Regions:
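N-terminal leader/targeting segments and the immediate start of mature chains
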Residues: 4-59, 104-108, 116, 253-311
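Short, hydrophobic/aromatic-rich segments at coil-to-beta transitions
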Residues: 31-37, 57-63, 121-128, 149-152, ...
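Intrinsically disordered, low-complexity linker/loop segments enriched in Gly/Pro
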Residues: 91-139
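Short, gly/Ser/Thr-rich active-site loops of penicillin-recognizing serine hydrolases
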Residues: 174-200, 303-311
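Short, solvent-exposed recognition patches
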Residues: 91, 188-274, 285-288, 292
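A short, surface-exposed beta-strand/turn
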Residues: 55, 75-76, 140-152, 249-252
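An acidic-aromatic
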Residues: 43-100, 152-169, 173
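Gly/Pro-enriched, hydrophobic low-complexity segments
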Residues: 120-186, 259-260
Length: 311
């Protein structure tokens, strides 16, 4: 590290651990007003976005606007995506570990304070989250020293290959005016999925990567049929994947897998006496993890996530 960086860094850096920084990032995500421009990279494709975060009607609102191509906007309120001009349940900024999950990250990742950097002209501290196995990706986060806002995020695979990068090129702590927090064009409202009770006959994984637990079970609309598709979300506190289950009936479908950047999808037909079910594992985990989860799926009476193994 250069002496210049060392001089600009707060003395408290030497005393604060990685977990303290993660908690500060989580708090900043919901408390710090800011605006800026960031670049998003995936699969050697680049896109530029403007972002505004501030308070409106007692809520923390974050608006993201695509600066290239067809107009595209996303709006989040209190951390929940409430509208997307493309009608997709996706968000661009990295999901940070919830406060209650920070302590257990050490089970799945080695947490390191790497050093200091400058991003968008601001002094940042660099955190590394190194996976302890092959079932999750590695992360490098550059956190603004003054605010705790994440200014740069890099995701890499087991071979050190870049999968995804987000980096601010301009960042200001000036609170945005209220009009900047309102979408300027059509922005389709995102309906919340309905929570459901576990069906009597539910495909459940018999294996999960170490550290992953079930965190949410819900129903999502099925555009091809009247029956809803059940969805179960699993997370290790940082990485996550969902398992979608759809009764097949007389439909014909083959197993398949795909990957785009860090996001993988593995579809596998699960046979049972009560009828076949197509399960699809989707998430930002290595393909080896998604495939093993999909192949472990079984239909059992009153299946629960507590019955799985993590070896």
């Amino acid at each position: 590290l250069s002496s210049a960086f060392a001089a600009m860094a707060p003395a408290a850096w030497a005393e604060e651990g990685v977990q303290a920084w993660l908690l500060r990032m989580q708090q900043a995500q919901q408390a710090v007003p800011y605006q800026g421009v960031f670049v998003y990279e995936r699969e050697s494709n680049y896109a530029t976005y403007r972002v505004w975060q501030g308070e409106r009607d007692g809520h923390v609102v974050q608006r993201i606007q695509d600066q290239e191509g067809d107009p595209h906007e996303l709006l989040q309120q209190d951390g929940r995506l409430i509208c997307n001009s493309r009608g997709q349940h996706v968000s661009l900024l990295p999901r940070l570990p919830a406060e209650e999950h920070v302590a257990r990250l050490v089970e799945s990742y080695e947490l390191r304070m790497v050093g200091r950097s400058r991003v968008a002209g601001r002094v940042s501290t660099v955190l590394a989250l190194i996976p302890r196995d092959k079932y999750r990706y590695g992360h490098e986060w550059h956190v603004d020293a003054q605010t705790g806002v994440l200014l740069k995020a890099v995701m890499i695979n087991d071979d050190g290959q870049l999968l995804e990068r987000l980096q601010f090129s301009h960042f200001s702590t000036e609170a945005p005016a209220e009009p900047a927090l309102i979408p300027q064009g059509p922005c389709e409202t995102m309906a919340a999925a309905e929570p459901v009770v576990t069906p009597v006959l539910a495909p459940m994984p018999q294996w999960l990567p170490p550290g992953f637990i079930e965190v949410r079970r819900q129903q999502v609309p099925n555009v091809r049929a009247e029956l809803a598709v059940s969805s179960v979300l699993f997370s290790d506190g940082l990485s996550s994947f969902s398992v979608y289950s759809e009764p097949m009936g007389q439909q014909l479908a083959a197993d398949a897998r795909s990957q785009l950047g860090p996001t993988v999808a593995v579809a596998h037909r699960v046979q049972s006496e009560q009828g076949d079910v197509m399960v699809t594992v989707v998430g930002e985990v290595p393909l080896v993890a998604a495939e093993r989860v999909a192949l472990s799926m079984r239909v059992h009476d009153h299946a629960t996530a507590s019955e799985v193994t993590h070896d």
